[in-house]
Curated annotation (Swiss-Prot):
This is Probable dipeptidyl peptidase 4. Keywords: Aminopeptidase, Glycoprotein, Hydrolase, Protease, Secreted, Serine protease, Signal. SUPFAM superfamilies: alpha/beta-Hydrolases, DPP6 N-terminal domain-like. Residues 1-17 form the signal peptide. Its main location: secreted. Glycans are attached at N38, N81, N104, N113, N221, N282, N468, N668. Pfam families: DPPIV_N (PF00930), Peptidase_S9 (PF00326). It catalyses: Release of an N-terminal dipeptide, Xaa-Yaa-|-Zaa-, from a polypeptide, preferentially when Yaa is Pro, provided Zaa is neither Pro nor hydroxyproline. The gene is dpp4. One of its GO terms (molecular function) is serine-type peptidase activity. The active site is at S616, D693, H728.
Length: 768
């Protein structure tokens, strides 16, 4: 578990119940102060906290480990309300970043000397701490903050770890190097950049069998994958070096060579490593999305395989002893794409049947639902159904034959917690699902207790429950202090509604009104889309009081904001999101323009000042919106945008656009290319990008700016801001604060822009 202040928990002193009832809408505050830039962007003053715990398996259900306020590790028992110190504060390593508890509580594995790599991955040194003597022993004797991953086996008798792209297994007696071919281009047990970012969403690619007798891991070969170089001009130095350091990153772009992937199985008893041939698709096109054990021991493992463009899927089981494979499930998704849900969970036999099953999330009915799949193959059974979607599996209770899950059953912007029995197929809400809200839950190891987390729209809180009880045992996190702060401020009013397209489909909208809103005044409006495939921005979760709140609070700005989830976004069914396949940017831009046209008709909107700003895919979408030359938007801000999908990674892009050879016209149409809208947008365009962006490369902004300049876009229509060495998040050397100050300045200028303003250059075309 990662360390941090958010994990502080004292059960002994928690309150009996929530003393401030939550309402089904966001708070607006009861004071008179307006939020300032410093109170929203620099150091937010309204910031609810939450608690995460590590449930552990002990004799008593309901035990969990947490880090106390003094830094010590403690174990708390819900049943006895007893707290025991596992590691005193003075015995915790000074630079500890994360920890993992031994299954029998005899020791702790610590990650120290942390160095970030990519989105999920990092390097660290690891130490094993005995909980009797508190002595620390290095996992590897000569480690130097260079271990990529480590974790206990389920039985606690071993630790699998990865160093220099090789897999090792540690036991109390010895450490064994399992692979020896790890190199800059060969990855064992950890994903390369693209698999980490786009497929696995994690920093490891190895999995112990439930009995810890076997270890399955993936081997990635990047030979032939093109290299992209990212320069670092400052490289964390105060004085720039004469020559920039360059990160050489194997980054496959559209239609380029992808890494190949193979499955390996280690028998711990023999030390033998076997290669498993997954023949679901051609080896050069094979994408492995998931590996999951379908057994309580080590008899078989499942591999979810996709073709290169991820519109064909096969689930293949591997008999561990014979290495024979069998395809037990297939799907065709050529009407769009197939998402990698990463949710396969083995449940075994159901009732009196001898057939074994696993659970997975699939949208084969047109909506993402829970399905029971026979391990031996055959027709699956829908465990949930309806025109709504399951968004996550929270827990599986095999003893009670229940699956706990989150779904959009009440509305796509909401999340409620349910259980469903695979014996009766009956679903039961754990919360009142008629009240608009976003919930989540964390269940104890044996499923007898859970922490129920209310995430909005009102101030979040957390309570502890026993299964089958409607009364909380106590409040874990009340965030009562947030209400004390809210008494001082007046906040923008947030509301939710739907816009109905001419086609009959609806778009979810989240609206913020300025704090002193008057329907008799006219206000500028800022659209803030993301809009990417399967994404969601319009949610009834707690909305952080950050930049959007600031621009609605500052009396010199007072912007209305609309966030609109266009076609292609998530949680409204396969048809709604699949429409954008092979044509990214077209329908999304149409929807944002249409929504802005509807906003312009409102009596309180200043139709002359309608701005749009987006980041990443939202930056791309902003660029496509300006390209439409609709005349409805008067200012565009593109932050870290894609400008041409040929510049982005293959596994994300081809999932939605297919290959360049198959869809050349689609790629041409999806690029930001037409410049008329950029010449005509009344308030101009601001483009922001980090030069050290290893995800959406600075190349995107550079190529777009070259196109706009080369086609004669006037200087008063185009402003460009790069951020030296900043990655996709733009934080390096104060970049974040500068970015938002610049954005606020442009919004201020847009609000006060007069119709006739503009240098003579903007009134005539330029010739070169």
């Amino acid at each position: 578990m990662k360390l941090g202040k958010w994990s502080v928990l004292l059960l002994v002193g928690c309150t009996a119940a929530i003393d401030i009832p939550r309402k089904p809408f966001p708070p607006t505050g009861s004071g008179h102060k307006r939020l300032t830039f410093n109170e929203t962007v620099v150091k937010p003053v309204i910031a609810p906290s939450s608690t995460a715990v590590e449930w552990i398996s002990t004799a008593e259900d309901g035990d969990y480990v947490f880090q106390d306020s003094d830094g010590s590790l403690k174990i708390q028992s819900i049943v006895t309300n007893h707290t025991q110190t596992l590691v005193p504060a003075d015995k915790v390593p000074d630079d500890a970043y994360s920890y993992w508890i031994h299954p029998n509580l005899s020791s702790v594995l610590w990650a120290t000397n942390y160095t970030k790599q990519y989105r999920y991955s990092y390097f660290a040194s690891y130490y094993i701490q005995d909980l009797q003597s508190f002595k620390l022993a290095p996992l590897a004797s000569n480690q130097a903050g260079d271990i990529q991953y480590a974790n206990w086996s389920p039985t606690g008798d071993a630790i699998a770890f990865v160093r220099a792209n090789n897999v090792y297994v540690w036991t109390a007696k010895s450490t064994t190097q399992i692979t020896t071919d790890g190199s800059a281009d060969l990855f064992n047990g950890v994903p390369d950049w693209i698999y980490e970012e786009e497929i696995l969403g994690d920093r490891h690619a190895l999995w112990f069998s439930p009995d810890a007798e076997y270890l399955a891991f993936l081997r990635f070969n990047e030979t032939g994958v093109p290299t992209f170089r990212v320069p670092y001009y400052m490289d964390n130095e105060e004085v720039a070096p004469p020559y920039p350091r360059e990160l050489e990153l194997r980054y496959p772009k559209v239609s380029q060579t992808n890494p190949t992937v193979e499955v390996r199985l280690l028998s711990r008893a023999t030390g033998e490593v076997s290669s498993v041939s997954i023949k679901a698709f051609n080896a050069t096109d094979l994408v492995i999305g998931e590996v999951a054990w379908l057994t309580e021991t080590h008899s078989q493992v499942a591999v979810k395989a996709f073709n290169r463009v991820q519109d064909q899927q096969k689930v293949v089981t591997v008999d561990v002893l014979s290495l024979k494979t069998k395809t037990i499930s297939e799907r065709d998704g050529t009407d769009g794409w197939l998402d990698n849900a990463l949710s396969i969970t083995y449940i075994g036999q159901i009732g009196d049947s001898k057939a074994e099953y696993y659970i997975d999330i699939s949208d084969e009915s047109g909506w993402a639902h829970l399905w029971l799949f026979p391990v031996a193959g055959g027709r699956p059974m829908a465990l949930t159904k309806g025109e709504w979607e399951v968004t996550a599996i929270l827990s599986i209770d095999k003893q009670r034959q229940l699956v706990y899950y989150l779904s959009t059953q009440h509305h796509s912007t909401e999340r409620h917690v349910y259980s469903v029995s695979w014996k009766t197929f009956t679903a039961t809400p754990l919360v009142d699902d008629t009240v608009a809200a976003v919930w989540s839950a964390s269940f104890s190891s044996q499923g007898g207790y859970y922490i129920l987390s209310y995430r909005g729209p009102d101030v979040p809180y957390q309570e502890l429950y026993a299964i089958n009880s409607t009364k909380p045992l106590c409040t874990i996190t009340s965030n009562a202090a947030v209400y004390d702060v809210l008494k001082q401020y007046t906040l923008p009013k947030i509301s939710y509604f739907e816009l109905r397209l001419p086609s009959g489909e609806t778009l979810n909208v989240m609206q913020r009104l300025p704090v002193s809103f008057s329907p008799r005044k006219k206000y500028p409006i800022l659209f803030t889309p993301y809009g990417g495939p399967g994404a969601q921005e319009v949610s009834k979760a707690w909305q952080s009081q950050t930049f959007k709140s600031y621009i609605a609070s500052d009396p010199e700005l007072e912007f209305v904001t609309w966030t609109v989830d266009n076609r292609g976004t998530g949680y409204k069914g396969r048809r709604f999101r699949g429409q954008v396949a092979k044509q990214l940017g077209r329908l999304e831009a149409q929807d944002q323009v249409w929504a802005a046209q509807q906003a312009a008709k409102l009596p309180f909107i200043d139709a002359e000042h309608i701005a749009i700003w987006g980041w990443s895919y939202g930056g791309y979408l902003t660029g496509k919106v300006i390209e439409t030359d609709s005349g409805v938007f008067s200012l565009g801000v593109l932050t870290a945008p894609v400008s041409d999908w040929r510049f982005y990674d293959s596994m994300y892009t081809e999932r939605y656009m297919k290959t360049l050879q198959e869809n050349a016209n689609g790629y041409n149409a999806s690029a930001i290319w037409d410049v008329a809208g950029y010449k005509n947008v009344r308030g101009g365009v601001l483009i922001q990008h980090g030069t050290g962006d290893d995800n959406v490369h600075f190349q995107n902004a550079a190529a777009l700016v070259d196109r706009l300049v080369g086609e004669g876009v006037s200087p008063d229509k185009l402003q460009v801001q790069w951020f030296t060495d900043s990655d996709h998040g733009i934080r390096y050397h104060g970049g974040s604060v500068f970015l938002y100050r610049q954005l606020a300045k442009r919004l201020y200028e847009e609000k006060h822009r007069k119709k006739s303003e503009g240098h003579q250059w903007s009134k005539r075309s330029l010739e070169f």
